[in-house]
């Protein structure tokens, strides 16, 4: 009788276990040359010699660490999406992402963002659901001048993309909200100062998303690491630590570590969590390299043990969980601030603005004495410090720009990714489609809009990567090519229903074989919204209703 040998553990490329040999092309690229070092080549070689001079490993790899992706070549529908068509899909222009840690900028910075758009990006500008600004049509020759202008107002594109710490989400009303438990602005600024652009964390296994807020207004459940305000019964205000969230093709909600962290320790604890990811994260398969996979395999108890014993060298303080919220906190509308002034939050459709609009908003802000502008994780824009005697003027001025502070449910609660207009991964048009879909829904569902006392969130994404968080929307729409009924395929969406964060956190449900074409979106959303109003129970939220509703009412 022979005894079977135990299976040898697969090498997942974990540095802490001595596995430094790169196991995929992306890891090979990083080992061959530090991605952050490409900035010098951009400034001294590529910007001078043009697009054709760019080395492919820089173009498709290291450029990301400076917020640059090539955008999609025009004229190719979703049937062309895929790595095998990269040579056709790769345009000679770039998407550039500007990170705004905490979503916070000054009026001067907003003006600079607007002018860069007008001068170099064909007047494009989109507010993302990570509080960034994204440009399109950027030429490599203009990148050094754009960087110079951003540097002058305290903004940067450093690590806005790539396997590194992305922009840090923060509350748009941090320090001024009457509802926040604590103002963590110092921690956000300190993490950005100490660690962003530094080599220690510039080579992580995969992207790494952070959210820090005294309110639950940053979608913390879908971030790799998050600190959320909570009151400890003995120690007072602090932050509750969460790890391992993320969506894409394997969605997972973050888990509570069960630790209360005082404000002054947040940067240290953030660095320790990031170090665990850097050293133990999986580097073999890109599709399983996010922190969430390590947390899932280890379990939260082991994660906390390693964090405390190997990195912090001390135990964390046990703490209570924050009370989950019923609905997204998007800061749209007029709110009174701690300082006695007002915040005005507005809802551009799916975050789409323009350089011209940003310049006009900067004018309005400066005329009202406002020097604090915020972007939100829901693709919204907020102006702080508006005095009472300027409030009507600012609200009217924003309204004239198409930026409503009292929008319909459909305008307020719809988000979208870049879509096939610019993204090489997309199968469907999303942000552009949203510009027509929202007015259509406002016309068709004006009566429902008046009846609704709860939001219905609608998130459009062009591919499975879920940049627009489809799995946690009431109605999530994932772009794909769908059967046209005549043996061909057309642009369409797979439907996810009843996803939510907060009280009903979860990914909802998919209906078997249920897909809609892009042309059917208005009809489908109207049908489901009317069924919700007709069949919901007293006080019932959409996510609750969708989980119990008959399939026929959801189709």
UniProtKB/Swiss-Prot annotation:
Cofactor(s) this protein cannot do without: siroheme; [4Fe-4S] cluster
Enzyme class: oxidoreductase
Top-level taxon of origin: Bacteria
Iron among keywords: yes
Gene3D superfamilies xref list: 3.90.480.20, Sulfite Reductase Hemoprotein, domain 1 (3.30.413.10)
EC number(s) from the headed UniProt entry: 1.8.7.1
Positions with a binding annotation for [4Fe-4S] cluster: 417, 423, 463, 467
3'-(S-cysteinyl)-tyrosine (Tyr-Cys) crosslink location in chain: 69-161
PROSITE patterns: NIR_SIR
Homology family: Belongs to the nitrite and sulfite reductase 4Fe-4S domain family.
Name recorded for this polypeptide: Sulfite reductase [ferredoxin] 2
Organism for this UniProt entry: Mycolicibacterium paratuberculosis (strain ATCC BAA-968 / K-10) (Mycobacterium paratuberculosis)
Name of the encoding gene: sir2
